[in-house]
Amino acid sequence: MKFKLTIYLLLKYYNLIETNYKIGNVNFGSEDATNFFIESLKKSNFYLEYGSGSSTILASNLNKTFISIESDKNFYNFLLNKIDNKEMLNFKSLGIVGDYSTPLFFNIRKHFLKSKVIHYVNDVLDTLSKSTKVPDLILIDGRYRVLCSLFLHNFFINKKDMPLIIFDDYLNRDYYHVIENFFKIRMVGRFAVLEELIQNDTRHLISKYTLDAR
């Protein structure tokens, strides 16, 4: 079974088979969370998301300026055909991935993925550091969510304005709650809304969370 799955994921990675993804309307598990995201996106002038999907299509349909970071090559190619502003969709490879962009054979490969992981999390921030324009809305909904939060903390800690940062699937996932050492949060449905930065050193956790793809 694992052999068949590996072959399937290899074929998918190299776009040798057609995958029919079903993307519905934006749904974050509750009316409160879904409406909060939609209204926040409508107000946004510049939106960044880690993890693509229905939110990407909505941002495109609303003619928003946005950057979407996607690590599943096959899904990235699928989305390219769904949006007009293709340059706003960015592929950052984590190699061959399975469901929800989890790297294949992660426990074996996690130490070898470190360079790719840093590119996935930080390339967009490196680009933004050279720009006068920064996002006012950020959705963390892809891989390496704690690491994304730590890098965002470091990026915005000395900036004048703090964006609205939404961390999806935070409710009931205790392994994410370490970020409360770095952000003051409030809950909206399953979202943690990161509202205020806390001055703390992230360096001791960066290496740890480059090995945690959750």
For every predicted segment, state its role.
Residues I23-F28, S44-Y47, F112-H119, I138-I140:
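Short, flexible loop segments at the rims of nucleotide/cofactor-binding pockets, characterized by
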Residues F28-A33, Y120, Y144, C148:
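Soluble or luminal CAZymes and related metallo-dependent hydrolases
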Residues F75-D84, D99-L104, R173-I179, L194-Q199:
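Short, charged, surface-exposed secondary-structure boundary motifs
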Residues L128-R214:
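C-terminal substrate-binding/active-site "lid" region of AdoMet-derived donor-dependent transferases
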Residues L80-T132:
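S-adenosyl-L-methionine
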Residues M1-F28:
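Membrane-proximal basic amphipathic "stem/tether" segments
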Residues E31-T102:
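SAM cofactor-binding core of SAM-dependent methyltransferases
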